[in-house]
């Protein structure tokens, strides 16, 4: 009798995989094990919950029970997997164990919290569960400090500002979105955030946090202090690799997989935010969707390599939305920036004048698909 496929995790990657497997095989045994409730929600919505006035429970799209019934699954929510015996093909928790033929790690990534004194006062918004734990504090907060000016930090800064809160954003870099694009490209969004009232503290460092009678005192470099009611860490994600490491799998930044999503163990695969595909960590929806389609085929006996096209990344800042694609972080590109009242098109070209990256904003986002075709040629 087949032990089937065991998936550790219940986020977007795990659900996409289940849906793709069930399109091809209605009966192969599927077991999902996860530490959370396994209810479905749309994670990108977390960037807009405050301005939308949404509670954590409002985000639920489908309960775990409904998901299990729809796709013929065995679910084990609120269950911590403690160990994987790769040789015996067994996954273990404190009170249970499961045999598998094929195992998929879809353990996601956790929010990185800077190691400063008082770090326990920082909140993270990387899951519905995390938002549920702090939603009252965030709703009641008048003054909010966001640590990190990357994609999530910029989205949250705009959202909290739109909700009428006094927002300060701090980052070591000289510009926002510094790991994604050069300052001459991100400056349009940076200017818009400033216009809205976001206080940007760039080239600045958080040194510590301390609880006071009236809030939280944040100590910064250059002998500066500000008092706020809530502090959110938006300083990036770290792939969850501890379980894979204990199982003896090859780990780098994430769980290392090849083009077939296979780890260093032939019967164990990794997918989503925890996976490092041929040296790349790709924590975005489109590569996860494409990876899930390929992995479903491979788990069912095919041998299909993952081929990723040029893909759009969307920055959900409603007052000035951005789409980007290609190697926007490359240092050697020349940027041709066309700015008009209705939006911006920035093209990054190499020494041979080949388009290697682009960023488009506002009404000019409709030009993204034409540029994407050029990028893919």
UniProtKB/Swiss-Prot annotation:
Annotated InterPro entries: FAD-bd_OxRdtase, FAD/NAD-bd_sf, FAD/NAD-binding_dom, NO_rdtase_NorW, Rbx-bd
GO cellular component: cytoplasm
Keyword Oxidoreductase among UniProt keywords: yes
Major site of localization recorded for this protein: cytoplasm
Cofactor(s) for this UniProt protein: FAD
EC number: 1.18.1.-
UniProt xrefs under PANTHER family: NITRITE REDUCTASE [NAD(P)H], PYRIDINE NUCLEOTIDE-DISULFIDE OXIDOREDUCTASE DOMAIN-CONTAINING
Record's function text: One of at least two accessory proteins for anaerobic nitric oxide (NO) reductase. Reduces the rubredoxin moiety of NO reductase.
Protein name per its UniProtKB record: Nitric oxide reductase FlRd-NAD(+) reductase
Gene name tied to this protein: norW
């Amino acid at each position: 009798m087949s032990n089937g496929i065991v998936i550790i995790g219940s986020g977007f990657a795990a659900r996409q995989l289940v849906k793709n497997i069930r399109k091809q095989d209605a009966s192969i045994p599927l077991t999902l094990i996860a530490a959370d409730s396994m209810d479905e929600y749309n994670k990108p919505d977390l960037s807009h919950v405050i301005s939308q006035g949404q509670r954590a429970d409002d985000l639920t799209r489908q309960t775990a029970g409904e998901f299990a019934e729809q796709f013929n699954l065995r679910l084990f929510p609120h269950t911590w997997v403690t160990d994987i015996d790769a040789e015996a093909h067994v996954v273990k928790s404190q009170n249970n164990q499961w045999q598998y033929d094929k195992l998929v790690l879809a353990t996601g990534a956790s929010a990185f919290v800077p190691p400063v004194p008082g770090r326990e006062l920082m909140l993270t918004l990387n899951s519905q569960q995390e938002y549920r734990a702090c939603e009252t504090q965030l709703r009641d907060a008048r003054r909010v400090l966001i640590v990190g000016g990357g994609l999530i930090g910029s989205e949250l800064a705009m959202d909290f500002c739109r909700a009428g809160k006094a927002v300060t954003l701090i980052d070591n870099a000289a510009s926002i979105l510094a790991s994604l694009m050069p300052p001459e490209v991100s400056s349009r969004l940076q200017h818009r955030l400033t216009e809205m009232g976001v206080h940007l503290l760039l080239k600045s460092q958080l040194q510590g946090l301390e609880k006071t009678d009236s809030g939280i005192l944040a100590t910064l470099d250059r002998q500066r202090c500000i008092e706020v009611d809530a502090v959110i860490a938006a300083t990036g994600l770290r792939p969850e690799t501890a379980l894979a490491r204990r199982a003896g799998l090859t780990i780098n930044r994430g769980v290392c997989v090849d083009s077939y999503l296979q780890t260093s163990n032939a019967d164990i695969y990794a997918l989503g935010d925890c996976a490092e595909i041929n040296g790349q960590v790709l924590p975005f929806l489109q590569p996860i969707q494409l990876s899930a389609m390929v992995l479903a085929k491979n788990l069912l006996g095919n041998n299909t390599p993952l081929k990723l096209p040029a893909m759009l990344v969307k920055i959900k800042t409603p007052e000035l939305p951005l789409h980007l694609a290609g190697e926007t972080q490359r240092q050697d590109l020349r940027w041709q920036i066309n700015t008009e009242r209705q939006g911006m098109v920035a093209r990054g070209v190499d020494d041979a004048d080949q388009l290697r990256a682009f960023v488009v904003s506002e009404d000019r986002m409709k030009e993204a698909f034409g540029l994407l075709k050029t990028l893919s040629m």
